């Protein structure tokens, strides 16, 4: 396995190796000591732009060793591929922002390439987002010069519309974006919503504002890559096209925990919905607390958000439930009660209607 040390990928390939009696070796793709004298039966890899890794993999391919790539970044490298559908991932992120009423969107990345282009294609299908590509605007700067990237981001923020929804290609880019925003006093998520194009729970949950991510289901991809490699080692011909699978879901965290609204009454209603879930707030009681009729509240919310007041309240309940379900210590009954559902079965029905998952499968 020649890859960056992503735990979900390593765990999945290791599981397949145990199940099928493989002798698995791991080589960091960025390492300098690639073992050119190694002669094995097959390789699963994450193929990027590192010259040493490419030279090593070309050497292995010249020996007739089958290779399965777990990314879509280097389609020019001749090998079998299994990767997440990046176009669908970009589209999923755009839908997440639009559901929260972020109308100005931007895609931020340090560099460009096939995977990023596919993310952008899906993201831009929802409208006309901006594109911030550091390497295109600062071609003489190093991609890992975080000071230069940060200064450039501050200049971009100065002229950007707000509220702004920003999708990044990688976890590291989302953390950098959050850091630059905090230095400028830009509120996240009120003025800037952030979605990372990759999930890394350990990194994204420890941020001052935990960052929402697209779950690219890398564990599934790695396991399917190992399955394909086994078939290639058994003599099966490589598929003519890359094997793609859909992104699993959006993992919502605080960086997009807002519904953008210009109407003060709508903002107040959203805040009331969110704060009153545990106490059983409904549209009628919210309208009464805000001093307007139910019809007025429904009309104003529909005009601002494009959905009814009841639909927005249900969305707030589901957002709360999903956040609580992310912690395995929270029992489903507790989650249902805190999110304003009448029972665990009521929550289960709502979650299945929303994303096709039960509370237990949502946690997996």
What are these regions (language model features)?
Residues 283-313, 336-361:
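Basic/polar phosphate-binding segments, predominantly the helix-turn-helix DNA-binding elements
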Residues 1-47, 51-289, 298, 315, ...:
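Bacterial carbohydrate/catabolite-sensing allosteric modules
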């Amino acid at each position: 396995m020649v890859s960056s040390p992503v735990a979900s990928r390593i765990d999945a390939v290791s599981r397949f190796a145990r199940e099928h009696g493989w002798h698995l070796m791991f080589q960091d793709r960025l390492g300098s000591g690639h073992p050119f004298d190694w002669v094995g039966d097959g390789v699963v890899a994450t193929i990027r732009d590192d010259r040493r890794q490419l030279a090593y993999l070309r050497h292995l391919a010249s020996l007739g060793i089958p290779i399965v790539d777990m990314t879509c970044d280097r389609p020019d490298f001749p090998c079998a591929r299994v990767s997440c559908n990046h176009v669908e991932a970009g589209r999923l992120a755009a839908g997440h922002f639009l559901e929260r009423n972020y109308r100005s969107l931007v895609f931020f990345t340090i560099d460009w390439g096939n995977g990023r282009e596919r993310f952008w294609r899906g993201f831009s299908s929802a409208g006309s987002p901006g594109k911030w590509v550091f390497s295109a605007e600062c071609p003489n700067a190093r991609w890992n010069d975080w000071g230069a990237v940060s200064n450039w981001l501050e200049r971009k923020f100065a002229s950007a519309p707000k509220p702004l929804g920003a999708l990044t290609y990688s976890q590291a880019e989302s953390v950098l974006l959050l850091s630059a925003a905090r230095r400028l006093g830009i509120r996240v998520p009120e003025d800037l919503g952030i979605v990372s194009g990759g999930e890394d729970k350990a990194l994204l949950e420890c941020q001052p504002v935990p960052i929402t991510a697209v779950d690219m289901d890398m564990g599934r991809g790695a396991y399917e890559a190992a399955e394909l490699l086994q078939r290639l080692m058994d003599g099966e011909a490589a598929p003519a096209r890359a094997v793609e699978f859909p992104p699993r879901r959006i993992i919502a965290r605080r960086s997009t925990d807002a519904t953008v609204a210009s109407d003060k009454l709508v903002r107040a209603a959203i805040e009331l919905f969110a704060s009153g879930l545990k106490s059983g707030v409904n549209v009628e009681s919210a309208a009464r607390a805000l001093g307007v009729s139910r019809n007025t509240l429904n009309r104003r919310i529909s005009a601002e958000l494009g959905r009814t007041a009841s639909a927005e309240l249900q969305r707030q309940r589901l957002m709360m439930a999903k956040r609580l379900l992310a912690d395995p210590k929270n029992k489903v009954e507790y989650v249902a009660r805190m999110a304003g559902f009448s029972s665990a079965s009521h929550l289960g029905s709502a979650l299945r209607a929303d994303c096709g998952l039960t509370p237990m499968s949502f946690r997996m």
